[in-house]
Amino acid sequence: MRGPDWNGRARRDRENHDMKRMLFVYNPTAGKGAAAAHLSGVVDQFTKAGWLTTVYPTQDKKDATRVARELGSYYDRVVCCGGDGTLSETAAGLLELSRPPLLGYIPSGSTNDCGATLRIPRGYKKAAELAAGDEEPLRWDIGTLNQQPFVYVAAFGAFTEVSYDTPQDLKK
């Protein structure tokens, strides 16, 4: 039994509708699970801005990379929500595409350091409005270290595991 022709149907649907398509990838465990509590409001902001949104909660490490790589080309924009790691994973997946869509980011990690550096507004509603908006995209460099892309910080040496080994309740 053959499954539905998702790829062909997505292309036909895009040709027949004016709504823009967004893939929203969020990490349900980032920032003590805060994203899940704001999910409805975030998706509502996307809908009000004219986006037809597919929501995908990551299931494990590197899942955002896989989903962005496998599904990203079917969307006009990919927005991720989570910590700096979720942003890096999502960007890594999109970098594997020949024509990646724009990437938006809603910070929801323990420290949101990257979001602050990029001047993304605090609060899910304002960050979702920015991610769904039509403003000129911000360009920033993406580095690679040992063929692994990173969007914010790359570290090596004795203290690289400190962030991962620190319990979540101590990060805030």
Task: Mark where each language-model region is.
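ATP/NTP phosphate-donor binding region
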Residues: R2, D13-C81, E136
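Active-site glycine-centered loops adjacent to acidic/histidine catalytic or metal-binding residues
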Residues: N27, D84, P107
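Short amphipathic alpha-helical segments
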Residues: A36-H38, A91-L94, A116-L118
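Catalytic core of DAGKc-family lipid kinases
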Residues: A49, T58, E96-K172
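Short Gly/Thr/Asp-enriched flexible loops that form oxyanion-binding sites at enzyme active sites
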Residues: T86-S98
